Design a protein with these regions (language model features):
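Canonical Rossmann dinucleotide-binding motif of NAD(H)/NADP(H)-dependent dehydrogenases/reductases
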Residues: 1-21
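Active-site loop-to-helix junction immediately N-terminal to the catalytic Tyr of the SDR YXXXK motif
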Residues: 64, 110-118, 130
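Short C-terminal tail/terminal secondary-structure segment
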Residues: 188, 199-213
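Substrate-binding pocket helix/loop in short-chain dehydrogenase/reductase
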Residues: 60-61, 68-73, 168
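Active-site helix of classical SDR
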Residues: 84, 120
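Short, small/polar-rich loop/turn modules that mediate ligand/substrate recognition or access, typified
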Residues: 136, 141, 198-200
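Residue(s) in the substrate-gating loop at a strand-loop-helix junction
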Residues: 104
Length: 213
């Protein structure tokens, strides 16, 4: 089950994986999880979930309003929570299931102008670890993929000129922008039933940005 399936990384996953996916995405505005997910009641088998919706709300701290924090938290954390609650019984019925959340390098290292997204993604990672612990006996794995800046539809404004692209590359230890296909391959790995002894982990696919100078 892919939530936010029109995202760049989700599309890369669908194009490069042999798995069969059930997809949900938004065309305009916000995905209505209450209404849109009702049709899952008729789906018999779900053995994986990837939650893609996210935000890139970069502002100086003094410019952030309470609604900025609440909106980021609603999309990144409450949305993921709502989907998991909807399908957790179906995941428990599977012979080993995997849930993957998408975080950000900003959840673990301090980046300017990332206060609201860093807070919400940190909360998402914390929720993933708690759920991993809660559902170990049910054999439902919860993991997180945390990329650095990746070339996606969300990051278009951050990479709209050659100068911005080069500046972003320079900030990365490997001097690269993230490739959606590489992020998708990591997600595909975590969805594989053969890797179901891995849970509660944050996989940082970030060109070394989290640990290297």
């Amino acid at each position: 089950l892919l939530i936010g399936a029109n995202s760049t990384i989700a599309q890369a996953l669908q194009e490069n994986s042999e798995r069969e996916f059930l997809t949900f995405s938004r065309s305009e505005g916000t995905l209505n999880l209450d209404g849109d997910l009702s049709e899952l009641d008729d789906v018999s088998d779900i053995d994986g979930l990837v939650y893609f919706p996210g935000t890139i709300n970069l502002k100086p701290f003094t410019m952030l309003k309470e609604d900025d924090f609440l909106n980021d938290f609603k999309i990144n954390v409450l949305g993921a929570s709502k989907v998991v609650k909807k399908v957790i019984n179906k995941l428990k019925e599977a012979d080993g299931a995997s849930v993957v959340f998408i975080s950000s390098v900003a959840a673990n290292i301090g980046l300017p102008f990332h206060a609201s997204i860093g807070a919400s993604k940190s909360a998402l990672e914390g929720m993933a670890r708690a759920l991993a612990s809660e559902y170990t006996n049910a054999k439902v794995c919860f993991n997180v993929v945390a990329p650095s800046l990746t070339e996606t539809n969300l990051s278009t404004n951050l990479l709209k000129t050659d100068r911005l692209v080069e500046a972003s590359k320079e900030r990365n230890p490997m001097k690269e922008i993230g490739d959606p296909k590489k992020i998708a391959k990591t997600i595909d790995f975590l969805l594989d039933a053969h890797n179901n002894w891995m849970t509660g982990q944050v996989v940082r696919v970030d060109g070394g940005m989290n640990n290297l100078k």
